């Protein structure tokens, strides 16, 4: 987990992890928070083990790479700090999915189809977001897993070379990792484990004060998408739906 301010969200996230049934070791990189986050991590009133490091806020993906490389676990789970886990078995369910044949990446939000330009097709999204999860239990195969929460075998992440730091602030990194997993002959899965996501507040902080920040962010997203679609032109478009599901989606899209 990488954090920069957002103390209230981080505290709520860490509190929600108390009930997790699967043992885990949390690694948090604090990228220069000035709102009490550092102090929270220093006193850390939670029962699970923590490794806390400090970094800069120039490249969050680089921070995540440094964080997961500090671990010695068989699996690595990347989690946004603005999430709250409701299902105590959320991690167990991710690990169970990764035990399925050819599984390589598991998460809680994703889409079954990516266009040639790298954009997802909205009607193929499946997720565990509350209040209305849409993914069928126990899991469904997808073309990509969103970075809000994803779990991957450490050896696979290492063989891929880690997260591609060229994307900067999250944009495109989840699509990139997902197709890299598929390139390695593995499948991506979205698991049924309900959770709350409080929605990109780190990235959008300050948009209401300075509209220029939003324009800059939009430009970064467009650049990241172009980078991704160029890098994986051999894999795009990507559609993991079966024939029956494609026909059903086609009919739904055309019915009034």
Where are these regions (language model features)?
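Short, acidic, metal-binding catalytic loop of nucleotide-sugar glycosyltransferases
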Residues: 15-24
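A conserved acidic beta->alpha catalytic loop
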Residues: 30-39
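Glycine-rich, basic loop-to-helix element that forms the pyrophosphate-binding segment
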Residues: 54-71
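Short aromatic/hydrophobic "clamp" motif used to bind/position activated sugar donors
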Residues: 76
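Conserved donor NDP-sugar-binding/catalytic core segment of glycosyltransferases
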Residues: 84, 88-121
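Donor nucleotide-sugar recognition loop
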Residues: 84, 145, 158-196
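A recurrent flexible, glycine/aromatic-enriched loop bordering the glycosyltransferase active site
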Residues: 132-152, 170
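Active-site-adjacent helix/loop segment of glycosyltransferases
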Residues: 176-256
């Amino acid at each position: 987990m990488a954090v920069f301010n957002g103390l209230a969200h981080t505290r709520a996230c860490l509190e929600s992890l108390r009930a997790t049934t699967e043992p885990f070791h949390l690694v948090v990189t604090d990228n220069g928070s000035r709102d009490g986050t550092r102090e929270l991590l220093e006193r850390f009133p939670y029962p699970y083990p923590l490794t806390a490091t400090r970094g800069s806020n120039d490249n969050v993906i680089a921070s995540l790479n440094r964080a997961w490389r500090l671990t010695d676990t068989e699996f690595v789970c990347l989690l946004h700090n603005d999430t709250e886990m409701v299902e105590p078995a959320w991690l167990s369910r991710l690990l169970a999915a990764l035990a399925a044949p050819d599984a390589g990446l598991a998460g809680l939000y994703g889409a079954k189809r990516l266009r040639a330009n790298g954009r997802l097709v909205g009607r193929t999204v499946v997720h565990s977001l509350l209040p209305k999860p849409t993914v069928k239990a126990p899991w469904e195969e997808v073309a990509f897993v969103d970075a809000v929460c994803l779990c991957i075998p450490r050896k696979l992440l290492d063989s891929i070379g880690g997260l591609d730091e060229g994307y900067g602030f999250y944009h495109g990194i989840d699509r990139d990792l997902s197709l890299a997993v598929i390139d390695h002959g593995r499948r991506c899965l979205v698991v049924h484990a309900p959770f709350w996501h409080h929605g990109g507040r780190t990235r959008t902080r300050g948009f209401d004060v300075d509209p220029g920040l939003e324009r800059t962010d939009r430009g970064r997203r467009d650049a990241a998408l172009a980078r991704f679609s160029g890098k994986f032109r051999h894999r795009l478009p990507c559609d993991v739906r079966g024939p029956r599901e494609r026909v059903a989606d086609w009919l739904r899209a055309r019915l009034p």
